Amino acid sequence: MNSYQNKNEYEILDAKRNTCHMSNCYPKYPLANDPQMYLRNTHYKDWINMCEEASYASSGPSQLFKVGGSIVAKILGMIPEVGPLLSWMVSLFWPTIEEKNTVWEDMIKYVANLLKQELTNDTLNRATSNLSGLNESLNIYNRALAAWKQNKNNFASGELIRSYINDLHILFTRDIQSDFSLGGYETVLLPSYASAANLHLLLLRDVAIYGKELGYPSTDVEFYYNEQKYYTEKYSNYCVNTYKSGLESKKQIGWSDFNRYRREMTLSVLDIVALFPLYDTGLYPSKDGKIHVKAELTREIYSDVINDHVYGLMVPYISFEHAESLYTRRPHAFTWLKGFRFVTNSINSWTFLSGGENRYFLTHGEGTIYNGPFLGQDTEYGGTSSYIDISNNSSIYNLWTKNYEWIYPWTDPVNITKINFSITDNSNSSESIYGAERMNKPTVRTDFNFLLNRAGNGPTTYNDYNHILSYMLINGETFGQKRHGYSFAFTHSSVDRYNTIVPDKIVQIPAVKTNLVGANIIKGPGHTGGDLLKLEYERFLSLRIKLIASMTFRIRIRYASNISGQMMINIGYQNPTYFNIIPTTSRDYTELKFEDFQLVDTSYIYSGGPSISSNTLWLDNFSNGPVIIDKIEFIPLGITLNQAQGYDTYDQNANGMYHQNYSNSGYNYNQEYNTYYQSYNN
């Protein structure tokens, strides 16, 4: 229990309060960063310029986060279905309001400011020159398609709609792509490029869904389907490559800019790119236009470092690599925050957070709590411990901090003195508080303005939030007890803590949600929505799942491999099934691209329900080398999928595709248990 829980003893500040003086009146931007700059030798005019620069950017982030957050929430089914998917997306970028639309311009201006890159009006005009025409063309197409759906005989004809689709396809590929990839501005335009690519792929998805009824010959439907797969690969690789190029350039500026770029491009680019494969109706069928996939993003993002402007806590006082190790986590199995042990210390009359330890558990592994390494100074330096506990079904969905202000003569502590955690179980909200207000000391409040509702257009509430706190990092080693740096890690709220399998959707579970603490997790390539599991030879993956109804499903796996080999899969030791994998790439596993991954049908069929006591999936690697596992997919029987040569992936030559209804499969899932199965404790 938190020993500082009695809120009556302390003042609880209004989050909207804005106490302004020279050192803190400009907006607390960017994001979670302490807004103060180095003020030593700063003149009044310089300070005014800093204020104006920060104010210029303050209108941009909300638009960027709204776009990225809304797209992700819509595709992942986190906000209600209202009308056709593409029509909804168009209204996101071109709201039906009388004022001039500035969504695209706001996004571009914000990223230019983030990158500190000059953006001329001429460049902005060139980049957005075709957007008005695109808007009109998309609106006409959406109206025609809606009329055709209402009455396929008396309103808009299939021929008319086909002409709109053909024209839009050319407009996207010829004009919009080039507009959003202007030389020298590729990174500035990247969120806009990803958003336009999303619109284009949704258009091509419509052809796959409605093309036959619209009167397209089967050869034309197949052509557009392969166009969709081609541009999915092209857009994914372009976005990831451009992102990485910009990320590399940020290393030369400093870690804070590097981390800020990484976070905001994840929210506005990489999260969207991770959704592109879900639009493939051959792999994820849809007859009603909806996406019937339960998917999630397991990537982790990091706040700006509180006190990153304080001498001794950041580059150049420490190396870039050291900062990365202090303020972020290495690739790891997905974890759920259970609570903290905090150590509070004092120097003279300054009381502060001097160290802490994260407590967490793995997915569907609430019975085993792990303690992370202690960060900062423990009680051997004096001070006392206190605890904050989070119940198994609850998460921290919002927080703010107070730390002492760094002011002349820069000799007093600048550490955190208070943290306010907002905790939810999705039915109610509660507050848990570390520390207290220090009314006689100058303090600075830090909020995290990327913590928003699911759609990214408003504040969080206990049942509507886009991220949860996953870890807290403390640097107390580079400048003694008076100066600590703090960063916070967050994961997306789409992640299901129980790996729930539902009977009416294809369910994707990322392999990083394994319940094995020693799993070999490697950094993701950027387009997968998270990190990857590297399954070594004769090693296994264990994944706990939850069935909410009696059902029968089969399993396929998204993987990458530079070798051929054999694997084995089962659930609860029932009917272990061997299947073969083929090489998907000749690249090193650190350089994987979109096309290096394939889906393999394991031919394993499982029947079970909530009454089964052990629902644990086991996947063994008997190949002569490591295999990269991205996701495990659970497919209810009866869903018809496209296959190519036994693999659920598209044929690069577009000639080898056929349909198989899994409900008619002749596989005997009651075959005798293979006595090979050995103890997994070896």
UniProtKB/Swiss-Prot annotation:
SUPFAM superfamilies: delta-Endotoxin (insectocide), middle domain (SSF51096), delta-Endotoxin (insectocide), N-terminal domain (SSF56849), Galactose-binding domain-like (SSF49785). GO terms for molecular function: signaling receptor binding; toxin activity. Gene3D superfamilies: Galactose-binding domain-like, Pesticidal crystal protein, central domain, Pesticidal crystal protein, N-terminal domain. It comes from the Bacteria. Keywords: Plasmid, Sporulation, Toxin, Virulence. CDD domains: delta_endotoxin_C (cd04085). Disulfide bonds: none annotated. GO terms for biological process: sporulation resulting in formation of a cellular spore; symbiont-mediated killing of host cell. Toxic segment of the protein is located in the N-terminus. Belongs to the delta endotoxin family. Promotes colloidosmotic lysis by binding to the midgut epithelial cells of mosquitos. Has larvicidal activity against Culex pipiens molestus, but not to Anopheles stephensi. This is Pesticidal crystal protein Cry19Ba. It comes from Bacillus thuringiensis subsp. higo. The gene is cry19Ba.
